[in-house]
Amino acid sequence: MLGIFFYSYVAIGFGLLLPAIRVQNFLNIGARFTAGYAMLTIYVYVIHVLGRLPLGLTVLSAVMFGTVGFGLALYREKLRHFPAILIHPAILLSGMGVISVLFNGGIDYIPFTIDEFTNWLGISREIHLHGGYEAIRKTVHLPGYTPGWRLLLLLPWQIGGEIEEGLSAAAPFVLHIAVVALIFDIAVFLMRTQGQIKNALAVFLAWIFLLLFLGVEGMGKLWSYTLLVEQPQIYSMVAVLLFIYLSGKITDSENSSRRHAYIYLGLVLAGSYLLKIAAALFIPVIFLFAVVPQISYPFFAESIWRYRLQFCFLTLAPILVMVISWSILNPSTSGLSSPFMTLQLLVNGNFNYSNQEIFNFSDRYFSAIWEYLSGYKIFISIVAAVGAVLILIKRREGALIVWVGWFVLYVLALFWSHLTIFGDYYFQHLNSIQRFLRIPVQLFHTLGLLLLLEYSISILKNQNLIHAMQYLKNTATLVVGGFIILALGSWQIRQVHHSVADTTTRIYQNMDTRILEMKQANEFIKSIQGTKIPTIPNLVILSQPLGHASRAYAKYFARSVNAEGKVYSRFRVNIISSWPNDPQIDYRNLAKIAEFKSKLRSADVIWPIRVDTTLVSMLAELGVSTNCLSFIQENVIVANTNEGKRHFICQKKFAPKD
C-alpha cells in the first residue's frame, strides 16, 4: 500500500509542476500523472546518478517537490475539479490496488524470472546495499543498461531503510494506471470535441471503453506479476505515441497548448529511454517525421519551419541530453552492455557468420516474427488494424506513422543484435522473440483501439446516434452501460486481487520451485550459521541435470550488510550441475568426478534440488545415511566437525533443528 501511495504521490506531484495542456474538454489528470512519472525517473537519474546526491536525500527531495506540486495546484485550482477527480481512473484504479493490498493482508514480492534476480531487482538490491549507484557503477552486471528501472524499484525502500520487494511491486502498477488515465482523458476529449457528447455521458462512455480496453489486456494485466522492464517499457512507449496523437488534435491556433504537449512528450520519451535503450529508436523517426512535410501532413497543417523545429527541440532535446550524459558517464566496449558499439562492425565487416549462415538466419528470424504476429492475440490485432486502416483512409495519422517507423527500426535492431551481440546459441535458436515482439504489438494494440474509438465516434455522430443516446441516457444507455461497467469493473477488481495475491505467494503462477528452495535455504542457513556451521558457510546446490539458475537465486538471497555496514554474501554458493552437457558425459570424465567430489567434501551445507543416482552414490561415500538418501530431495545435509573429524548430518529441509 505504501508503494502505491509513494509512486502515485510523487508522480502526480511532479506532474502538477508542469504547465497545463489547456485545451477545451481535455482533463490534464492522466497527462500530468504520466509525465510526472517520467519526471521522477529523470529526476532520480540526474540528481542521484549524475549529481551523486545520496539515495535517502534524493527520495526526500523528490517527495518535497511532489508536495510543492500539490500545493501549487491547490492554490491555482482550489477544489474546482474535485468531483471529476473523484471518479477519475487515476483515483479509482489506485484505490482498487490499495483495497486489494489491504484485503490480502499486505503485499510481498517473490521474484519470478532469472532476469529479475540477475538484472532488475538483483541490481536494485546491490545499489541499495552499497548506498548508491556510483558504488557499483563499474562492477554492475550489464553496465551499459540505462539505470532508470533499477533505480525506480528501490526508491520506496529508502523510506524505512529496508529492502521490501512488495513496495517495488507497485512501480509498474502505478505507471500503468497513469497511462490508462491518459487514455481515458483522450477518450473523453474525443467524445466531447468530435462527438459533441455532453460531459456526463462522455465520462460514462469513456469508462466503458477503458474497462473494455483493460478487459482485453491491451497493455497486459493492470497489475503486472513481474518486475521485468518490458511492461514499463510498453507503458512509457505507449505514452509517447499518445502524446503525439494528442498533439495532432490540438489546432495551430492553440500553439501554447501544443508546445506544452510537446514538453510532456519530450519528458516521457526521455524517461522511456532511461527505462530501456530501445526508446532511442524514436529519435531518427521523430526527426524525419518533423522535417519531411510529405510524411507529417496534416500534423503540421502550416508548413512553417518554426513549428517543426519547435517540435524537434521540445521532444528530442530531453532524450538527447539523457543519451549524451549516459554515454559520457558510462562508456562501454561491450556490445551487450552498449548496443551502439556494434555499429563499428558496419565499418570493418568483421562478422562471425558467413553470408549463407546470415541468409538462413534471416529466413528463420522473419518466419518467427510472422508466426508470432499471426498468433499473439490475433483478434485484438485484427480489431486494432481495422481501426488503423479506417483512420488512414481519412488522413495520415502522425502517431501511427511514428509507430511504423519505430517498428521497422526495432525489428532491424533485433536482427542486428542476433548477428553481433547475443552469441552463437541465440543465433541458432533466436533470443526470446516472443518477449521482444510483445512490445511493438501491444503498442499497436493500444493505438489501434484508440483510433477505432475515434472512427466509431465519427460514425455515431454522422448517423445521429449520439443524439439518440443522449435522449435515452436515463433509460437504455444507463442500464446497459451500467451493467457493462459493473461487470468489467468487477472483473478488474478480481484480476488486481489475483495479481496482489500472486506476487506475494505465486499461488497462480507455474513458478520455478528452485526460487522458493533457495529462499528457504537462505532462511535455513541464517538459523544455524555461526553456531553449527561457520559464519560464512559454503553452500553446495545439487541440481543434476537442471541448469544453473538456482545459483543466481541463492546469490540474490545471500546478499546482506554486516554490523560494520559492509556488503557481503551471507554464504558462498557452489553448484553441481552438468548443464548444458549431458551428465553422463561428465561422469565419464575423471577430472569432473574429482571436481564434484571435492565440492561435496568442502560443503558446509548441501542442498539437494534434483539428484541422480551417481550423485547419491557420491553422497553415500561421504557417510550420509541410507534413510537420508532415500528421501534426499526432502532433506538438507549439514557438515559437522567433531573431535577434528568431519561428518555429515541429515536434517529436514524446512524444519532446521535447534
Where are these regions (language model features)?
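Membrane-embedded, hydrophobic transmembrane alpha-helices
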Residues: 1-85
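Hydrophobic, aromatic-rich transmembrane alpha-helices
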Residues: 10-20, 75, 176-193, 374-404
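Membrane-interface alpha helices of multi-pass inner-membrane proteins
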Residues: 45-48, 261-277, 283-288
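Perimembrane helix-loop-helix junctions
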Residues: 73-77, 282-316, 393, 564-570
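Hydrophobic alpha-helical membrane-interfacial segments at the cytosolic entry of transmembrane helices
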Residues: 87-100, 267-268, 300-330, 403-406
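Active-site lumenal/periplasmic loops and adjacent helix-entry segments of GT-C-fold
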Residues: 99-203, 221
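Membrane-lumen/periplasm interface segments of specific transmembrane helices
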Residues: 109, 292-296, 306-388
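Membrane-embedded, lumen/periplasm-facing catalytic core of multi-pass transferases
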Residues: 486-558, 653
